[in-house]
Amino acid sequence: MKKDEIKALEERYAKAECPVVSNNSAHRHTPDVPMVIPEINPHHIEIIPSQRKRLGTKRGFIAVKSNCSLQSYLPAMAVINMKYPIDRAIVTTYQAISGAGKTFETWPEMVDNLIPYIGGEEEKSEQEPLKVWGKIEGDKIVKAAAPAITTQCLRVPVSNGHFAAVFVSFENKPSKEEILNIWKEYKGAPQELELPSAPKQFLHYFEEDNMPQAKLHRNLEGGMAVSIGRLREDTQYDYKFVCLSHNTLRGAAGGAVEMAELYAAKGYFD
């Protein structure tokens, strides 16, 4: 379906008083549609009353998930950014074939192969974080102006699990120990509310240089946790590190279920 057709369909469901939690990208940049990572920006659900007013609904609304690639790197960046604002970042993602709806049986060309381009992914990976980091102003979510993010997105011969290599610079550089402590101690709304799908520990850091690995860690905590490793200082940026998440669990279906649980816990399905 075309994007305008999907937008119209989702609005029809909402106007029929059916809450819509969507993985589709059609409404991601609609100003009064929240694009929520439950552990990062749960407060964005507060835009729903404004959206309901526009749609003329009492119970129906539209909420969307961000692109699956963001789930690998944005959580690790976002929780640091809450205390130490990030000035700029370079992100390269290495995305599994299941992100294209494929398996090695249906896409044999990907065996022993790599494709250095995924249509539309780089634009999503640069722009969508700014909405997640945005603020509610009146009846809309206004995107953040920073950090400046530049990305490259590659398709790699892995069945499941999106990986990211991240370089970040800060307005005021924290110590490595401060970053590690932020990752270790962070708990978001899903953990505080004990949502059924939420991982007990959202962010897991691995000290070993060869960790995390897709085959070993993508299913951590039911595929809902984010794995991080190799944090170290960089010669051009302040720090660099790698991240991993399960793209069809945390990044898609599982994340959508967790998001629905958050809306239910906050009374938006009543």
Where do the language-model regions lie?
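N-terminal Rossmann-like NAD(P) cofactor-binding subdomain of oxidoreductases
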Residues: 1-110, 114-117, 146-148, 220, ...
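C-terminal substrate-binding/catalytic lobe of Rossmann-fold NAD(P)-dependent oxidoreductases
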Residues: 88-93, 97-240
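Short, charged, low-complexity patches
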Residues: 122, 249-253
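Glycine-rich phosphate/pyrophosphate-binding beta-alpha loops
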Residues: 154-158, 245-250
